[in-house]
From Swiss-Prot:
Transmembrane residue ranges: 5-25, 68-88, 97-117, 138-158, 164-184, 189-209
Reactions that this protein is recorded to catalyse: H(+)(in) = H(+)(out)
Record-level GO cellular component terms: mitochondrial inner membrane; proton-transporting ATP synthase complex
Assembly with partners or alone: Component of the ATP synthase complex composed at least of ATP5F1A/subunit alpha, ATP5F1B/subunit beta, ATP5MC1/subunit c (homooctomer), MT-ATP6/subunit a, MT-ATP8/subunit 8, ATP5ME/subunit e, ATP5MF/subunit f, ATP5MG/subunit g, ATP5MK/subunit k, ATP5MJ/subunit j, ATP5F1C/subunit gamma, ATP5F1D/subunit delta, ATP5F1E/subunit epsilon, ATP5PF/subunit F6, ATP5PB/subunit b, ATP5PD/subunit d, ATP5PO/subunit OSCP.
Function: Subunit a, of the mitochondrial membrane ATP synthase complex (F(1)F(0) ATP synthase or Complex V) that produces ATP from ADP in the presence of a proton gradient across the membrane which is generated by electron transport complexes of the respiratory chain. ATP synthase complex consist of a soluble F(1) head domain - the catalytic core - and a membrane F(1) domain - the membrane proton channel. These two domains are linked by a central stalk rotating inside the F(1) region and a stationary peripheral stalk.
This protein's name: ATP synthase F(0) complex subunit a
Matching Pfam families: ATP-synt_A
Compartment(s): Mitochondrion inner membrane
InterPro entries in the cross-refs: ATP_synth_F0_asu, ATP_synth_F0_asu_AS, ATP_synth_F0_asu_bact/mt, F0_ATP_A_sf
Predominant location: mitochondrion
Keyword tags: ATP synthesis, CF(0), Hydrogen ion transport, Ion transport, Membrane, Mitochondrion, Mitochondrion inner membrane, Transmembrane, Transmembrane helix, Transport
GO molecular function: proton channel activity; proton-transporting ATP synthase activity, rotational mechanism
Length: 226
């Protein structure tokens, strides 16, 4: 019986009960809040990384935008940790599910848009009609800008889903080819194993980059509306 390539993306269950919630909570179990008065090296490294990420994300924001710092740092840590945990053998990556990514993207995008219309109504409406637009093109440009606005959360979710899913499929295919070639051609199997190792290293980088890109785009949407 042939193995389904997409079997690893099916939501795992125990006695018919989905365990996605347990998987999502795993990063919080692995990285608990420090309770010591003096931090150890691991905690100090984590805090340094958090401060570095905050500096990169919050440098473009004003006072109102910086109130989202906790939300943005939680978002990037959550996506990054779930992506990395999904690279472990026999594990499940929640960010390969489009429904989950849409569940993150739509509320965050909607919050930034509502915030913009609430505090900067004229500036938000001005985005639908660029300055200097010829009068005959006004209706068409308004429609195009409206569509592009509503596509933003879909683009966020699809980008994350596609990149993570594609990487897992490539690793699955190359890993399967390596196992098959082991008994047929050990020399070729060693080459595919080296490729698999390099691809795994690349996927670790992609897991972190996609978390940063997702959070950075949310930060840019927030900057446009504050």
């Amino acid at each position: 019986m042939n193995e389904n390539l997409f079997a690893s993306f099916i939501t795992p269950t125990i006695v018919g009960i989905p365990i996605v919630i347990l998987i999502i909570m795993t990063p919080y179990i692995i990285f608990p809040s420090p309770t010591r008065l003096i931090n150890n090296r691991l905690t100090s490294l984590q805090q340094w990384l958090v401060q570095l990420i905050l500096k990169q994300l919050m440098s473009i924001h004003n006072t109102k935008g910086r109130t989202w710092s906790l939300m943005l740092i939680s978002l990037i840590l959550f996506i990054g940790s779930t992506n990395l945990l999904g690279l472990l053998p026999h594990s499940f990556t929640p960010t390969t599910q489009l429904s989950m990514n849409l569940g993150m993207a739509i509320p965050l995008w909607a919050a930034t848009v509502i915030k913009g219309f609430r505090h900067k109504t004229k500036a938000s409406l001005a985005h639908f009609l660029p300055q200097g637009t010829p009068i005959p093109l006004i209706p068409m440009l308004v429609i195009i800008e409206t569509i592009s606005l509503f596509i933003q959360p879909m683009a966020l979710a699809v980008r994350l889903t596609a990149n993570i899913t594609a990487g897992h499929l490539l690793m699955h295919l190359i890993g399967g080819a390596t196992l098959v070639l082991t008994s047929i051609s050990p020399a070729t199997a060693s080459i595919t194993f080296i490729i698999l190792t390099l691809l795994t290293i690349l996927e670790f980088a992609v897991a972190l980059i996609q978390a940063y890109v997702f959070t950075l785009l949310v930060s840019l949407y927030l900057h446009d509306n504050t």
